[in-house]
Amino acid sequence: MDKTCRGFAEALAAREPVPGGGSASAFVGALGASLCGMVARYGAANPALADRADDLTRAFAQADELAQELVELVAEDVRAYGQVSAAYGIPRDDPARTTAIQDALHVAAMPPYRIMDACGRALALLEDMADKGSRQLLSDVACGAVFCRSAMQGASLTLFANTTSMKDRACAEELETACDELLDTWLPRADALARRAADAARKRG
């Protein structure tokens, strides 16, 4: 799925089932990871931060990988939810319909979980950049954290929309528990990072 920013926004606004919230969440997460990469690159090139240049170089490589992973999850979510839409389109009198829907729901729950997991890893890098990157770029670190937080929460809503309809409750509850653990771990940390940046900006002002 290769679109301009305008094209992606128009695709989201269209009266079509995909792309939807899951794909949008993946893209927002990719923006957060990309901001992390930018901060790390500036830091690695800054002579004043030469003592941590190796760490910063590793960080931007990791951030680039996460951004690419999240961009790929935009398309993966589209494909997965496309299977759900196709399954619901099977005639109701077809005995294969129920199984097809359930199989598709399970497939569609996986990209949102992977989006959440990638955003958690990006948030860990952003926390590191708050400590090791340039003070002048702390607001960019915080923006990245806010984006990854929003992406994680958005992806969780997409995941829950799928698990709610799953008949295999054991599988659904396992996914929901894993999702809740990510939310409980990372949302407060993202909020703390944003507050830290806001406080620092006000002190400089």
Language-model regions, residue ranges each:
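Conserved phosphate/anionic-ligand binding catalytic regions in large, soluble enzymes, centered on
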Residues: 14-37, 137-155
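Transmembrane signal-anchor/signal-peptide helices with a preference for the extracytoplasmic
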Residues: 38-50
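Amphipathic alpha-helical interface segments
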Residues: 77-146, 150, 162
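Preference for long, well-ordered alpha-helical segments
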Residues: 115, 122-125, 136-205
